Design a protein with these regions (language model features):
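Periplasmic-binding protein-like
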Residues: 59-60, 214, 387-410
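C-terminal capping/gating helix-and-loop segments adjacent to ligand/active sites or protein-protein/ligand interfaces
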Residues: 51, 154, 405-412, 425-480
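Short, solvent-exposed loop/beta-turn-alpha elements that line the ligand-binding surface or hinge
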Residues: 128-143, 188-193, 245-271, 333-334, ...
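Helix-loop-helix "hinge/cap" segment bordering the ligand-binding cleft or interdomain interface
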Residues: 149, 153-237, 245-292, 375-381, ...
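Alpha-to-beta junction loops
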Residues: 98-110, 122-125, 217, 314-322, ...
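Conserved N-terminal structural module of periplasmic/extracytoplasmic solute-binding proteins
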Residues: 2-16, 21-123, 133-141, 398, ...
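Extracytoplasmic/periplasmic substrate-binding proteins
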Residues: 59-68, 234-235, 270-378
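Hinge/lid segment of periplasmic solute-binding proteins
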Residues: 113-170, 232, 353-356, 420
Length: 485
């Protein structure tokens, strides 16, 4: 609701702070990777530089304390260099640093979607001979297998990164507004039982209309639909998968290229685009899916994560798709507190109705980040000690509580006391469902190129530059070519 929310000033403050940190991250990445040097200090301590999200700079002291409690030598200090908030830009920064054989930062926080190309180029340290047997065994046996797969060499199976946290989104909503409109989220088990996209959209439209529609709330729903990696890997991938569609004919073809079908012109993929066009343009768009109402507008085609979060946090949207970090922000008492609800993402078709195994039903993009070690570091032993300390349960829980980043070991969350986790503890049931229904991106050495092809063509369809069929026919040709290069 515009300018009438009593908490708007508080929320604006939160947004401004995070925006400042993100902007600082872009500058900090360039400065840190290009010139800041760690190493041995005059007092005998060794400073290990970790390039990570800007958020981690704000909680650096708490993380360092947890690392010491986990056994990290107190002669080692951690310095967080805030990386660019946009994953594509961060990849380019890391590529430049490693191409130049720079020794800093010592540790990179790398997106699981583009770690493998760095592994194949032998630009990050092979950890098989560096980590202790106990740590290697834990990663192999207890960590999420899908996360570990994106941190290992696809041919040799050797480990080159330690999963820092997996990421999978949830649907957030204003529970107070939904209940005022006559719905019963708790009685209907919204937190754990997914709706169909059609049922969900009709409900969103009804709640939005009940509260005055666009005159009172700019959006019924916000998500990420800008032309960037997040559209290809995540919002489009998960929605397409929930309709039973796929880039390359199913899950078995995600990680090996060259001899797999390209299937983006199939009907479930087209239906996904038509639904999104209905959400943004309504029945004024002749390509919009007739079974879905308008619940937002085309501002979405400019939105990445923070762009989509801000209207929701500021009280101008009712539903919002995003990663767990934003649940922490929106669940704070100076935001929505217990008026924030979460639910699994809706589904397009039931699992049994997809021609591909494991598709259909609720699907959540599997994101996440790994810790990789710079092989040019002058402090390799200390860097390895830091990475090993991050494998500790209490370190994982500290990061989870303070920043909403999920532990890579499911049992750590299951054993945690929700009351000790802050706002995120209220939403573990939804996160558990999301974690059981994830879809990875098709990560191969050519995925960075293919991701750009995907998000540009999907974006052209979302912005009405092309029909869904035209965009997917063009994408089909591009993916077939790049898969053979």
């Amino acid at each position: 609701m515009v300018d009438t929310d009593p908490n708007s000033d508080l929320r604006e403050s939160s947004v401004s702070r995070r925006r400042f940190m993100a902007a600082a991250g872009a500058t900090g990445a360039a400065m840190g990777i290009a010139g800041c040097t760690g190493g041995d200090d005059d007092d005998g301590t060794t400073t290990i530089q970790l390039s990570a999200d800007a958020d981690f700079e704000a909680i650096e002291d708490e993380i360092e304390a947890a690392l010491y409690d986990a056994g990290l030598s107190e002669d080692i200090e951690l310095e967080v260099l805030p990386g660019d908030f946009e994953t594509d830009s961060r990849r380019e920064d890391y590529q430049a640093a490693l191409d130049a054989n720079r020794g800093d930062p010592d540790i990179f926080m790398m997106d699981s979607g583009w770690t493998i190309p760095f592994i194949l180029r032998e630009q990050v340290l092979n950890l098989e001979e560096q980590l202790s047997d106990d740590v290697l065994s834990r990663i192999e046996n207890e960590y999420l297998e899908a996360s570990v797969d994106t941190a290992t060499h696809p041919e040799t199976g050797e480990l080159f990164g330690v999963p820092f946290f997996p990421d999978y989104p949830v649907m957030q909503y204003r529970k107070d507004l939904v209940e005022e409109a006559g719905y019963d989220p708790e009685g209907e088990n919204w937190a754990t039982e997914p709706m169909s996209w059609e049922e969900w959209a009709e409900m969103v439209a009804d709640v939005w209309d009940y509260h005055g529609g666009e005159d009172e709330y700019t959006y019924g729903f916000t998500t990420q639909a800008a032309a960037y990696e997040g559209l290809a890997c995540c919002t489009f991938n998960e929605t397409m998968s929930s309709f039973g569609g796929a880039f390359f004919g199913g899950r078995e073809n995600l990680f090996e290229r060259g001899d797999r079908p390209v299937t983006v012109t199939e009907e479930p993929v087209i239906e996904t685009i038509r639904m999104m066009r209905a959400f943004m343009y309504g029945d004024e768009d002749e390509e919009a899916h007739p079974d879905f109402p308008q619940i937002t507008n085309d501002d979405l085609v400019q939105y990445t994560e923070e762009d989509a979060r801000e209207p929701f946090t500021n009280g101008n949207a009712i539903f919002h798709r995003n990663w767990p970090y934003s649940v922490v922000i929106n669940g704070e008492e100076d935001a929505f507190g217990e008026d924030l609800g979460t639910m699994p993402l809706p589904y397009g078709v039931s699992p049994g109705d997809s021609q591909y195994d494991g598709l259909g039903g609720t699907q959540h993009a599997l994101g996440g980040w790994h810790l990789t070690v710079n092989p040019n570091s002058q402090n390799l032993d200390a860097a390895i000690e830091v990475v090993e300390a991050f494998v500790d349960d209490d370190v994982m829980l500290t990061v989870f509580e303070l920043n909403g980043n999920l532990p890579p070991v499911p049992e750590v969350v299951e054993a945690a006391d929700p009351d000790e986790l802050g706002p995120i503890g209220r939403y573990l049931d939804t996160l558990a469902v999301a974690g059981e229904h994830t879809i990875p991106r098709p990560v191969t050495d050519v995925w960075p190129q293919q991701a750009a092809q995907v998000y540009q063509e999907v974006h052209d369809a979302y912005t009405q530059e092309k029909t869904p069929e035209e965009a997917m026919e063009d994408l089909q040709e591009q993916l077939e070519t790049s898969d053979q290069d």
